[in-house]
Amino acid sequence: MNIGGGKFLLGRISNNPTSGIVGLANVGKSTFFQAITNSKLGNPANYPFATIDAECAKVNIPSVPLSNLLRIYQSAKCVPGTLTIYDIAGLTRGASQGHGLGNKFLNDIRHVEGIFQVVRGFLKEDITHIEGNVDPVRDLSVVQDELILKDLEFLENIRERLSKKMRMVSKNSKEHQEMKIETELLDALEEHLFNGKKIRHFKDHWNLDEVKILNKHNFLTSKPTLILLNVSPQDYVRNENKFVRNIIEWINEFSPGDKFLLFSAEFESQLMECKGIASEYFDKIKEDTNVSDQQLVSAIPQIILEMRKLLNLISFFTCGPQEVHQWNIREGTTAQEAAGVIHSDLRETFISADVIKYDDLKKMEPPLNESLLKSKGLIKRAGKQYIMQDNDIALFKAAGGKIKK
């Protein structure tokens, strides 16, 4: 997708975005899954491969504009945008060769659009570590190496198929030239992978031909990644951990562009279980760390919003007396394409859209006075090629007098 300035976005991101939770066994993936989805799905247990089949659940994307627009429009209900989360089986060394649940693990990753990579940063003797000791940098390297090895295998298979096809068509044909360009890109990516680097970080800006090639093949290391260091509740509320510096150094060298956050699966689990911080458990944390109630907050909203940003997602809203609806779209989406997210017919019959900027509305008091907005020139007519902006409010108009609110 072209987001302007000749920049094209890498990745096959849908309007119903998905992310998978990955990492070694026993690092807190399933506990994190339960916390982020506010459910009892998943199987957090103190042994490897407690999760076999990937669980999934939808989570709401936090949105201040959504609740504010509900108030301004006095709508009967609101429908938030969502992100589908998968709890994927734990990885082990040799996964790319099929060891453990390797083939299933890697196949599950191929079907998601973003990756939450959980690494263990807490010390607890009663919770075993599959590698024998806690070392998040080693764990990051193990997972990345397995993804790279699988991509190298996949890349070689693609190149062999291309080589056979190229011998069957004229060297002067357009098809041959396209396959030659693809082969040259794959050769460059292979060298990059051999250096222990992800495809996603091969370059900062991709051209349209490169994006088409990479999105077609859906390489594992082309997916955006949010690294989550699972620490003790005490480290989390103090926002410190002895492994942080080494992790940041590793990211800068081997995975630049990946984002990194601290969280505590135990803290989030207790927060969900106790339905707040009014409990002896959190009183003990405050006593141990000398922090205030204001510091005992969940990391989940920030984690979801960070993944939203990594997936290059924005939102637009349709508003009316029945509902305020938040819709996921990707940066660079046109007004006509956004209409198609609501219904494919609306894209085909699109005429125009009336667009209001959220910033022009957010301080207004209900009930909304659309006549006042029009008199101030705050309702803009947008054509097919208008590029939607984050938090736009849109009323789409279609042929045949059909209007979708």
From Swiss-Prot:
Keyword set, alphabetical order: ATP-binding, GTP-binding, Mitochondrion, Nucleotide-binding
Major localization class: mitochondrion
Known function: Hydrolyzes ATP, and can also hydrolyze GTP with lower efficiency. Has lower affinity for GTP.
Residues annotated for ATP binding in this entry: 26-31, 231
Compartment annotation: Mitochondrion
GO cellular component annotations of the record: cytoplasm; mitochondrion
GO molecular function, one term: GTP binding
Gene3D superfamilies in the cross-refs: 3.10.20.30, P-loop containing nucleotide triphosphate hydrolases, TGS-like domain
Protein name according to UniProt: Obg-like ATPase homolog
Limits of the OBG-type G domain: 17-283
A Pfam family reported for this protein in Swiss-Prot or TrEMBL: MMR_HSR1
Superkingdom as given in the UniProt entry: Eukaryota
Entry's family note: Belongs to the TRAFAC class OBG-HflX-like GTPase superfamily. OBG GTPase family.
Domain TGS: 312-398
Further remarks about this protein from its record: Present with 2360 molecules/cell in log phase SD medium.
